[in-house]
């Protein structure tokens, strides 16, 4: 399929709750979902991302893909897709996030990273690419990714979770970069890599 432009903060599709993908009585998914999943994987891979939600490429459907280390410091990676995810988490800390351990980035906020409070454990239930039920869970970075991508599908950005000086720094970065308006995007493989991979 294709690498697709990634929408940047300010695009309304990022602030709109996505629509669940319909499932047939026989458990089948619409044929075009396979193409969407391929586009998501190709775009995420070209961007060197650990996850990508459909609305980040302008498609308001409830699906995300991931290719993420199992947890910080471990060598293994987990790769997959979750359709119509439902998220569960452990408690989210109410303290100021640690700038060394809690830094988070987003392909829709290219090149920026800010400390973000997240639960250390998360689980999503949903469907795989064949429409079969799946459960995916993890801790650390993997849990952070599950929360981040499901948040996208609910119409939120990680910037919404920032507090204190980190929230102020993010607002300055959005303004400095000229974001926060509709119609902005970047295309992995064509535009410079904002994260310097």
Curated annotation (Swiss-Prot):
Cofactor remark: Binds 1 Fe(2+) ion.
Gene source species: Mycobacterium sp. (strain KMS)
One of the record's GO molecular function terms: peptide deformylase activity
Residue numbers binding Fe cation: 106, 148, 152
Task of the protein: Removes the formyl group from the N-terminal Met of newly synthesized proteins. Requires at least a dipeptide for an efficient rate of reaction. N-terminal L-methionine is a prerequisite for activity but the enzyme has broad specificity at other positions.
UniProt keyword terms in alphabetical order: Hydrolase, Iron, Metal-binding, Protein biosynthesis
The protein's name in its UniProt record: Peptide deformylase
UniProt-listed Pfam families: Pep_deformylase (PF01327)
Catalytic machinery residues: 149
Catalytic activity: N-terminal N-formyl-L-methionyl-[peptide] + H2O = N-terminal L-methionyl-[peptide] + formate
Listed EC numbers: 3.5.1.88
GO terms under biological process: co-translational protein modification; translation
Highest taxon listed in the record's lineage: Bacteria
Coiled-coil region: none
Cofactor: Fe(2+)
Family annotation (InterPro entries): Peptide_deformylase, Peptide_deformylase_sf
Membership in a protein family: Belongs to the polypeptide deformylase family.
Gene3D superfamilies (alphabetical): Peptide deformylase (3.90.45.10)
